[in-house]
Amino acid sequence: MINDVLKEAEDRMVKAVEALKREYATIRAGRANPNMLDKITVEYYGTQTPVNQLANISVPEPRMLTIQPWDKSSLPMIEKAILKSDLGLNPSSDGTVIRLLIPQLTAERRTEIVKTVKKKAEDSRVAVRNIRRDSNDELKKLEKDHTASEDEVKRAQDDVQKMTDKFVKEIERIMGTKEKEIMEV
């Protein structure tokens, strides 16, 4: 019973950290990264479809993305979706390929992005702490139901705390790396 609670807590904490990594992958850091386009969807045959499912996205140069749609008729729609997105990119098209030149980030924009990065890290820390609280509540319930002894529950709560500390430290590390990447000129 206690092991189930600990395993579930760890699985949920891992998912919280993975979600943060995915979120950070979509944040623009002055370098071309195909993941920047993950959140952009295009109305395609009546369905909102992610750009990465409509085209081949490649990085020919460190500051350029090329988007080559498999269906050429989707090219103008992809272009429009990129313009509407909050990425601040201007697509240029030659009729078969869309080129996205990634401009150098201004100091002001870097600061804004770092604030976003910190907020997302804080949201992840809160999620991990909420998982800790839920796990501790489940452990107390086991003790109350006499399914586990007080000592076992105390030990398990210590394990949950160690786990929480480990994942919060991991979130801090990921945030620091992303922050450094953004502030790099």
UniProtKB/Swiss-Prot annotation:
SUPFAM superfamilies given in the database record: Ribosome recycling factor, RRF
The keyword Protein biosynthesis is annotated on this UniProt entry: yes
Chief location: cytoplasm
Gene3D superfamilies xref list: 3.30.1360.40, Ribosome-recycling factor
Annotated segments matching region Disordered: 137-158
Function as written in the Swiss-Prot or TrEMBL entry: Responsible for the release of ribosomes from messenger RNA at the termination of protein biosynthesis. May increase the efficiency of translation by recycling ribosomes from one round of translation to another.
The name this protein goes by in its record: Ribosome-recycling factor
Species: Desulfitobacterium hafniense (strain Y51)
